[in-house]
């Protein structure tokens, strides 16, 4: 089965303006994803890391990419196709609570 990385974006305002029964259904959906072995978590504070030409590590305590909504969480899921992965994340809190979820196919590099 193929692996996918998902990035959920959303904020508290969008969450709060979503009906409680929809939020509850989304959290139940997340529980079902957990039960299938999906690796899921909320986003902490990011740190950028650079080591240009291997000449020394430089860090910046902030996200590199910018978006209208903050990153809320990440998941690694398995599905037969990207369409199946989309169907899996369509019921998650970020998808239903005025946020958005990106689905990225994970191309696993062979071990060297």
Regions found by a protein language model. Name each.
Residues 1-112:
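Conserved, structured core segments of small domains
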């Amino acid at each position: 089965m193929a692996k996918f990385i998902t990035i959920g974006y959303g904020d508290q305002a969008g969450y709060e303006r979503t009906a409680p029964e929809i939020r509850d259904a989304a959290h139940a959906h997340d529980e079902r994803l957990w039960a299938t072995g999906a690796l899921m978590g909320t986003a902490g504070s990011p740190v950028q890391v650079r080591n240009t030409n291997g000449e020394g590590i430089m860090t910046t305590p902030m996200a590199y990419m910018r978006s209208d909504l903050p990153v809320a969480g990440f998941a690694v899921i398995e599905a037969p196709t990207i369409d199946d992965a989309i169907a899996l994340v369509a019921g998650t809190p970020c998808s239903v609570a005025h946020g958005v979820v990106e689905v990225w196919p994970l191309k696993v590099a062979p071990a060297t």
